[in-house]
Amino acid sequence: MSAVKSALGDMVITFLWVILSATFGIQTAAIVSAVGFHGITWAPLVISTLVVFVSISIFTVIGNVLGGASFNPCGNAAFYTAGVSSDSLFSLAIRSPAQAIGAAGGAITIMEMIPEKYKTRIGGKPSLQFGAHNGAISEVVLSFSVTFLVLLIILRGPRKLLAKTFLLALATVSVFVVGSKFTRPFMNPAIAFGWAYIYKSHNTWDHFYVYWISSYTGAILSAMLFRIIFPAPPLVQKKQKKA
């Protein structure tokens, strides 16, 4: 029953995250315009990081309210592989499809809600710049990189929640910017599926190969390396006193 509750929470938070994250570009452009930062090369990157920081902060609260809900199946798999998750293989198998359904619902909803003039400025249509094989390699590397950074920040990073959240936002934006030269990097199979569903490419081999197999591979390999570098402390069993 707890696995089903987790899956439902994941579906809800992924639905909401897709709607919000689809507008990051619009939010960044609006803020740049409002503060008069046109022509300043670093402004969009800094503002994007702040937008993501605020968004992650809000969704951390929402996730806690929903009982630890998550919008990234690769994250769930990585924490399980690293040995720091209460998930089982069964719960992971339930949560991942729920996140994909939530992402598809969010993508459909935002495309219906957004005014026509903004539709070309939102969304996340998967884009392979150099073919499926190169896209798969880049997605493995990007997923590996961002997963290791996330594990490092959350498990070995600063204790202050705001500091953790800011570093997560910085890592996410940095990896996304680097990866945009090769694919539209998702590092999140559920969200990739949601937008692929909009563009009718969700049931293709290239989509499954690049955005599911490769993303999971990168995340799991990263978690395995993290577990080797930072092994969990051994459990110390207390000796029972003799009566």
UniProtKB/Swiss-Prot annotation:
SUPFAM superfamilies, sorted:
Aquaporin-like
Identify the keywords attached in UniProt to this record, alphabetized: Endoplasmic reticulum, Membrane, Repeat, Transmembrane, Transmembrane helix, Transport
Cell compartment(s), UniProt: Endoplasmic reticulum membrane
The record places the motif (NPA 2) at 188-190
Segments carrying motif NPA 1 = 72-74
Pfam families annotated for this entry? MIP
Q: Which Gene3D superfamilies does the record match to this protein? A: Glycerol uptake facilitator protein
Task: Give the transmembrane ranges.
Answer: 12-32, 42-62, 90-110, 135-155, 162-182, 210-230
| UniProt note on tissues of expression | Expressed in roots and above ground. Expressed in elongating regions of the root tips, cotyledons, minor veins and hydathode cells of the rosette leaves. Weakly expressed in vascular tissues of the flower petals, filaments of stamens, upper part of the styles and receptacles of the siliques.
Its cellular-component GO annotations read: endoplasmic reticulum; endoplasmic reticulum membrane
| Alphabetized InterPro entries for the sequence | Aquaporin-like, MIP, SIP1-1/2-like
Q: Which GO terms of the molecular function aspect are on file?
A: water channel activity
Its chief place of residence is endoplasmic reticulum
Q: How does it sit in the membrane?
A: Multi-pass membrane protein
Give the PANTHER family listed for this entry: AQUAPORIN SIP1-1, AQUAPORIN SIP1-2-RELATED
Note what the entry says on domains.
Aquaporins contain two tandem repeats each containing three membrane-spanning domains and a pore-forming loop with the signature motif Asn-Pro-Ala/Cys (NPA).
Member of which family? Belongs to the MIP/aquaporin (TC 1.A.8) family. SIP (TC 1.A.8.10) subfamily.
Function (record text) = Water channel required to facilitate the transport of water across cell membrane.
Protein name as catalogued: Probable aquaporin SIP1-2
The source organism is: Arabidopsis thaliana
Q: Highest lineage ranks of the organism?
A: Eukaryota, Viridiplantae, Streptophyta, Embryophyta, Tracheophyta
